[in-house]
Design a protein with these regions (language model features):
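Positively charged n-region of N-terminal signal peptides that target proteins for export
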Residues: 1-4
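A ubiquitous, low-specificity "background" feature that marks scattered single residues
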Residues: 8-9, 75
């Protein structure tokens, strides 16, 4: 009798645990929006974390979108700034920001990718995210207007979007990460 009661209690516990999801892995993919707001000139640590988080999320099976907003739009603009504009630079601040070799080695190890396939600068990194991993990258068109940025001067990985499309990105996201 005692043994039957123990078996019955164990069965009830197992049924309860299964019904509330204990012991099952919740592995559904999320739609993640990374809201990148801070320019490289203001805080390089924030903007440089964005591609690492994006890659890690993609590797975990999530869909990732990056929204470049606020002062960060200046970091994806070719020749931004009076001096770069004067000399006609065709690079962005992200293109000029190298990935330290120790970070490249760490990414190679963590992501299981040969070192020669790891980008050398953050501009290449954003291209890699978009072209190899399928990350969508958008930029706030209104903020570009405020900074007097011609959308044609924005990095090719970034698609300028109006405010209504930005709002759609926010409402469609399951999770929003802000940098």
């Amino acid at each position: 009798m005692k043994q039957r009661l123990l078996c019955l209690m164990a069965a009830i516990f197992m049924a309860f645990a299964w019904s509330i999801g204990l012991g099952t892995q919740q592995a559904s993919a999320a739609n993640i929006l990374i809201h990148m707001k801070t320019s490289l000139a203001l805080d390089d640590a924030q903007i440089c974390a964005v591609p690492n988080v994006a890659w890690t999320a993609v590797k975990a099976g999530h869909t990732v979108t990056i929204l470049v907003d606020a002062s960060a739009v200046t970091s994806v603009t070719k020749g931004f700034g009076w001096f770069r504009g004067l000399i006609g630079s065709d690079s962005t601040a992200l293109d000029r920001a190298s990935l330290p070799e120790r970070e490249r080695e760490s990414l190679s190890q963590q992501m299981g990718v040969p070192l020669d396939q790891i980008p050398h600068n953050y501009g290449e990194y954003f291209d890699f995210l978009k072209n190899k991993l399928g990350v969508e990258i958008y930029g706030n068109q209104t903020m570009m207007l405020l900074y007097k940025i011609d959308p044609a001067r924005v990095a090719s990985a970034v698609t300028p979007v109006p405010l209504d499309r930005m709002m759609q990105l926010f409402t469609e996201a399951d999770r929003i990460i802000v940098y």
